Amino acid sequence: MDISSWFESIHVFLILLNGVFFRLAPLFFFLPFLNNGIISPSIRIPVIFLVASGLITSGKVDIGSSVFEHVYFLMFKEIIVGLLLSFCLSLPFWIFHAVGSIIDNQRGATLSSSIDPANGVDTSELAKFFNLFSAVVFLYSGGMVFILESIQLSYNICPLFSQCSFRISNILTFLTLLASQAVILASPVMIVLLLSEVLLGVLSRFAPQMNAFSVSLTIKSLLAIFIIFICSSTIYFSKVQFFLGEHKFFTNLFVR
């Protein structure tokens, strides 16, 4: 092998490495256990390149002259695919984050909101707990293998440096699924808190000397924790595992 072909092979390898990097990078920014709050940028970027180097040979890639002519457009396409894939993989974490926010809003504990280091947003304490809970169940149930399978599936649907179309119109379906699942999972606690509000209202009507507002937060918090304790080992745990088997649906929701 002469020097020119050696440099050409290095050039091709770097192009492939950057193409895979642009698809993987959004995953490390959106997933709660891989973003800035958990892994520092000085460590995360080399890890992305290391994972990308292992995925280069996952499929056959034809690099022709058109790739070099439209390299910026193709890199932008890889970023879009990575973003859509990140949205699909982050869906269970966003759902449980919304569940915690809804429950804290209903029990009147949003005053304790603080900056969540895993998401970088102002969030309630229960939302952070549910986010970490979903991440633990996700990883315990083989989440990293699921992520690699989803990446592999994305390359089968939309190969590297090839043309593919996006069904961006289905973003409304994605948002509907996010909101509906959050309300469904939070509904047991919401129903119990609504009944407690009715009982506290009756109590304040017949015993006005007892300030129902001063004890409402304590009572509703105890009831919410009790219902969460019952649902966490059944409904919530199985719901996270349900999303682990739906990578084909979520990936095909956007890319064809």
UniProtKB/Swiss-Prot annotation:
<feature type="transmembrane region" description="Helical">
    <location>
        <begin position="37"/>
        <end position="57"/>
    </location>
</feature>
<dbReference type="GO" id="GO:0006605">
    <property type="term" value="P:protein targeting"/>
</dbReference>
<keyword id="KW-0812">Transmembrane</keyword>
<feature type="transmembrane region" description="Helical">
    <location>
        <begin position="129"/>
        <end position="149"/>
    </location>
</feature>
<comment type="similarity">
    <text>Belongs to the FliR/MopE/SpaR family.</text>
</comment>
<keyword id="KW-1003">Cell membrane</keyword>
<comment type="function">
    <text>Required for surface presentation of invasion plasmid antigens. Could play a role in preserving the translocation competence of the ipa antigens. Required for invasion and for secretion of the three ipa proteins.</text>
</comment>
<feature type="transmembrane region" description="Helical">
    <location>
        <begin position="183"/>
        <end position="203"/>
    </location>
</feature>
<feature type="transmembrane region" description="Helical">
    <location>
        <begin position="217"/>
        <end position="237"/>
    </location>
</feature>
<dbReference type="GO" id="GO:0005886">
    <property type="term" value="C:plasma membrane"/>
</dbReference>
<dbReference type="InterPro" id="IPR002010">
    <property type="entry name" value="T3SS_IM_R"/>
</dbReference>
<protein>
    <recommendedName>
        <fullName>Surface presentation of antigens protein SpaR</fullName>
    </recommendedName>
</protein>
<keyword id="KW-0472">Membrane</keyword>
<dbReference type="Pfam" id="PF01311">
    <property type="entry name" value="Bac_export_1"/>
</dbReference>
<dbReference type="InterPro" id="IPR006304">
    <property type="entry name" value="T3SS_SpaR/YscT"/>
</dbReference>
<keyword id="KW-0843">Virulence</keyword>
<feature type="transmembrane region" description="Helical">
    <location>
        <begin position="13"/>
        <end position="33"/>
    </location>
</feature>
<keyword id="KW-1133">Transmembrane helix</keyword>
<feature type="transmembrane region" description="Helical">
    <location>
        <begin position="79"/>
        <end position="99"/>
    </location>
</feature>
<keyword id="KW-0614">Plasmid</keyword>
